[in-house]
């Protein structure tokens, strides 16, 4: 099963994702391949749609995953099927799960000010201020160059 994971890792790396994202996506496929070898005792190309649906229900039930996480797993199974197994994918056979939209809680200006003031280092204060005021992600701020500003 390692050759499937290696092929997946190679194909997914072509998408230009961060190392953290690549690791997470590989974790979904590793879990799937482990399930196939230990529970179904099948190769990935021999798995039916019914067995894929059972696996998704098993993920939701046994690991208590959120619908968002299950959708991410389905998305990676789709990529794996299309680009590693070179088999067609039918969205009607394994639809994405619905989930409730929610608004994230945002700290008040006073809370952010207290947090930034508590930071001992000027560099940390500058990075936190930039993240808060611009909406950049941590990885984006860490990779900023002087020319970018």
Give residue ranges: language-model regions:
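Conserved catalytic core of the tyrosine transesterase superfamily
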Residues: 1-149
